[in-house]
Structure formats: structure tokens, C-alpha cells
UniProtKB/Swiss-Prot annotation:
Domain notes: The reactive center loop (RCL) extends out from the body of the protein and directs binding to the target protease. The protease cleaves the serpin at the reactive site within the RCL, establishing a covalent linkage between the carboxyl group of the serpin reactive site and the serine hydroxyl of the protease. The resulting inactive serpin-protease complex is highly stable.
The protein's role, per its UniProt record: Probable serine protease inhibitor.
Site (Reactive bond): residue numbering on this chain: 357-358
Species assigned in the record: Oryza sativa subsp. japonica (Rice)
Gene3D superfamilies found in the cross-reference section: Alpha-1-antitrypsin, domain 1, Antithrombin, subunit I, domain 2
InterPro entries cross-referenced by the UniProt entry: Serpin_CS, Serpin_dom, Serpin_fam, Serpin_sf, Serpin_sf_1, Serpin_sf_2
Family classification: Belongs to the serpin family.
Protein name stated in the entry: Serpin-ZXA
GO cellular component, one term: extracellular space
GO function terms (MF aspect): serine-type endopeptidase inhibitor activity
Origin superkingdom: Eukaryota
UniProt-annotated stretches for the region RCL: 343-367
Coiled coil: none
Length: 396
């Protein structure tokens, strides 16, 4: 993999983990202590890179530095193009995960998209551009966007634009959706799934269904953290998707773990299990999360405020003089993740050193309290989904 692609992916991961830490902070109104959270930083990254393609001046610079570190907007588009080709291609025909990604630009009919922007959107981002009538038919446009997302995500995400989210003053909506469904390389035996106690952050506990297994697993143990890697079946290409469960030792260790990931973006890379070990007690709860939020406030808190303000420069997007008054009113994002015995259904909008050792000690992995998870493509290190589970019983 090219060095510049590695650097871009490192920036994408640090953007992902900054967002995850902000969303999983107990203070955040959308996420916070009471909800399970799932979102796709990859999906948001690509949507914002597309905004950068239509931005000029300080707005473009701010987007480029938030998303890609020191570098140009052109670098972002090249990266997006590689992501769409490398990571987001569907592999279900060859028995690998089903991946469906869609990007849409919905612009009011009074504005015409600049050809250069349209070319980048369609050519590099595989985005669809739609000319719509926000001024007199806002509600109809909203349902058009929603049915587009529903189609792409195989019906898992039915509504990315909530009622009232667009009106006659809306000029531009960017929507994106990501659907992922993978089967575990080693499925869990459903007859072994049993109810057990899951400890909540407030000290109470609930009875939840836990999957268990006696087969060897990829587990790494540290003083205050255990990491489990669950690989998905591969298709005919080199990609290898995996889910990682990061289980803090402390029952209430979730927030400090999220903060650690945020402050050390390379934390995950350094803590990836590469060897299967014999398991002792193994318990992982089934869970299903549907999580949607409006991301602009969160993005502003990470220093991205120009695209959302009246000072936004999105003049590279549309031809008309009205382009000067154009800004991003909101960014709606929705994700869906389900983990069960078969695998995962999710949507959104090294060199091995082998050492001989004495008889292996069986490793326990009992996820009976809140934990973080992420889904990553291991060859590139691209993070597709991040989230946390505070209570596996919460309905999706």
C-alpha cells in the first residue's frame, strides 16, 4: 500500500476516533451515558470531503485540515476515490461481506451545479446528483432522499431526514449511506446462547442474551483492557473485515477508554490481536443499534465551523450568484449495527513473530459490562463503524 495512502488512512482514523470520543462522552446530548451509539466515521469523512470539493478559500482549507491533516483538498479527493474502490466495493458475489455505499447531492433547482464539482462528485465519489424543488415541495424532497437511502441500505435505514429537517429555505442536502453485512468466519452456536447478567454504568444490571463458544479466539489482554477480534468471511479479494470489541477491565471504564483512543490514534493499531488463544469463559452479548444524529454541532466542536456559517465559501459547487450565500445547514447521519450468532449487519448513512511457549493459559473474555466496538478493514486499517454498548437490551 502506498505511503501517502497510509498517511491519509491514519488521518481518517484519528478523525474517526475524535468523533467517537466526542459522541461517547457522557456529556454529549446525542450519545452520552444512556444510549448505545453507532456511527460510520468513514461515511461522514467521505460526505465532508465532497463538501470540500465544492468549497473555496478558508472553508476548503478548514475542511482539508480537519479531515486530512496538512495537505490539499485534491489529496482528499484522491483518497476518497481509493476508498470507494478499495474498501467500499461489494464482495458478496464471492462470499465476502455485502457492502453498499451511496453518496447523494440534492440541490435546489434554482441553482445549477458547477461542471467541475459534478465531475468530481460523480467521477471520484460515485455520487448521484439530483436537482430538486425545496422551495415549493420540501416535504416531497425529504421523502425522495429517505427512499433513496432506504434502497441503498436494503431497508435498514428508512429515514435519514427527520420531519421538518428541510424547508423552503434549504438549498442543498448531502446524504450518504453505508450498508455492511458480514458473516463471522466462525459462527456462534445459537443453542449455546444463554441469558446472563450485564452490568450497567449506573450500578444496576439487566438479564441479556450472551453468545458463548469454546473455540480459540483472537484475544489480547492488558492490565485494564481486553481486545477481541472477530474476523468476517472473506470474498475473493485481499480485503479482510473484522469487528473489534474493546472491553475495559473496570465496569465503568468506558469513558476513559474512549478518551484514551482519542488521545492516541495509533492505540488501536498497537493493540490488535494477531494470534488465536484457548478460551476459558467466553461471553459476548447480542446487540442491535440504530443511531441517528445531526452532526453539525459535533463537527463545530471539533473546529469545523466555516462550512456551517454564513461565511461559508461554497462557490465551487454552484454556478449562480446565490452560491455566495450557500452554506451547509445540517449533516444528518444514521447508522445501524446488529451483532448476532451469524455475524453483523450494519448500515450507515505485520509480520507475525512466532514464539514457543509453555502450555497456554486459557483466556477469559466476559463482556458483561459496557464496551466499545469498531469494524475495520484490516489490510488498509480503514475504520467503517465505531460505537459503544451501554445496555444490550436497548431496542434499536
Amino acid at each position: 500500500m502506498a505511503a501517502d495512502l497510509r498517511v491519509s488512512i491514519a488521518h481518517q482514523t484519528s478523525f474517526a476516533l475524535r468523533l467517537a470520543a466526542a459522541l461517547s462522552s457522557p456529556a454529549h446530548p446525542a450519545g452520552g451515558a444512556g444510549r448505545n451509539v453507532a456511527f460510520s466515521p468513514l461515511s461522514l469523512h467521505v460526505a465532508l470531503s465532497l463538501v470540500a470539493a465544492g468549497a473555496g478559500g478558508a472553508t476548503r482549507d478548514q475542511l482539508a485540515s480537519a479531515l486530512g491533516g496538512p495537505g490539499s483538498a485534491e489529496g482528499l479527493h484522491a483518497f476518497a476515490e481509493q476508498l470507494v474502490q478499495l474498501v467500499l466495493a461489494d464482495a458478496s458475489g464471492a462470499g465476502g461481506p455485502r457492502v453498499a455505499f451511496a453518496d447523494g447531492v440534492f440541490v435546489d433547482a434554482s441553482l445549477s451545479l458547477k461542471k467541475t464539482f459534478g465531475d468530481v462528485a460523480v467521477g471520484k465519489y460515485k455520487a448521484e446528483t439530483h436537482s430538486v424543488d425545496f422551495q415549493t415541495k420540501a416535504a416531497e424532497v425529504a421523502s425522495q432522499v429517505n427512499s433513496w437511502v432506504e434502497k441503498v441500505t436494503s431497508g435498514l435505514i428508512k429515514e435519514i431526514l427527520p420531519p421538518g429537517s428541510v424547508d423552503h429555505t434549504t438549498r442543498l442536502v448531502l446524504g450518504n449511506a453505508l450498508y455492511f453485512k458480514g458473516a463471522w468466519t466462525e459462527k456462534f452456536d445459537a443453542s449455546k446462547t444463554k441469558d446472563g447478567e450485564f452490568h450497567l454504568l449506573d450500578g444496576k444490571s439487566v438479564q441479556a442474551p450472551f453468545m458463548s463458544t469454546s473455540k480459540k479466539q483472537y484475544i489480547l489482554s492488558y492490565d485494564n483492557l481486553k481486545v477481541l477480534k472477530l474476523p468476517y468471511q472473506q470474498g475473493g479479494d485481499k480485503r479482510q473485515f473484522s469487528m473489534y470489541i474493546l472491553l475495559p477491565e473496570a465496569q465503568d471504564g468506558l469513558w476513559s477508554l474512549a478518551e484514551k483512543l482519542n488521545s492516541e490514534p495509533e492505540f488501536l493499531e498497537k493493540h490488535i490481536p494477531t494470534r488465536q488463544v484457548t478460551v476459558g469463559q467466553f461471553k459476548l452479548p447480542k446487540f442491535k443499534i440504530s443511531f441517528g444524529f445531526e452532526a453539525s454541532d459535533l463537527l463545530k466542536s471539533l473546529g469545523l465551523h466555516l462550512p456551517f456559517s454564513s461565511e461559508a465559501d461554497l462557490t465551487e459547487m454552484v454556478d449562480s450568484p446565490e452560491g455566495k450565500n450557500l452554506f451547509v445547514s445540517s449533516v444528518f447521519h444514521k447508522s445501524f449495527v446488529e451483532v448476532n450468532e451469524e455475524g453483523t449487519e450494519a448500515a450507515a448513512a505485520t509480520a507475525a513473530v512466532i514464539t514457543l511457549r509453555s502450555a497456554p493459559i486459557a483466556e477469559d473474555f466476559v463482556a458483561d459490562h459496557p464496551f466499545l466496538f469498531l469494524i475495520q478493514e484490516d489490510m488498509t486499517g480503514v475504520v467503517l463503524f465505531v460505537g459503544h454498548v451501554v445496555n444490550p437490551l436497548l431496542a434499536a
